[in-house]
Amino acid sequence: ILEFRPALAAWEIKWPGAAVVEKGGDAITSGFAERLAEFDAMNLDHYRRSLAALGALRRDFARFEDFADGFITLCSPTMPPLYPETGDSVFGDVSSCLGAPAWSLPLLEDRGLPMGVQLMGNPHRDYELGCIGRWMMGQMREG
């Protein structure tokens, strides 16, 4: 579903990254420097195909707008990590690509650690999604 995302990110960081390298490059990690070399190989046609794929995904998602006010997913594909790790934010990639608001609600728990539920809404419906999230948090406190 998100195969175009790395290409979009690569294209959008290509020139700022090159500017950092030009100034000396010591401000970036070796891993990022390697990625910049990969980004250099990308061309405008690849970027445009990636944008078209993103547009198609957003159009498909828009068909659900009258069907659902929100969607519930987990915030992370695994249980909460122990400090100092922060976990995997892969579910946030979906809402970012869709241009959809998302709220992480600490509704679950594992090993005494909060485990978030992600409430994702329709684009430009941030306020409505916030109201739903507030209601969900209230229900959990009462229950």
Language-model segments: residues:
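Short, surface-exposed loop/helix-turn segments at secondary-structure junctions
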Residues: 5, 49, 76-94
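Structural helix-boundary/capping segments
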Residues: 48, 52, 97-143
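Short amphipathic alpha-helices and their capping/turn segments at secondary-structure boundaries
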Residues: 59-64
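Conserved acidic residues
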Residues: 69
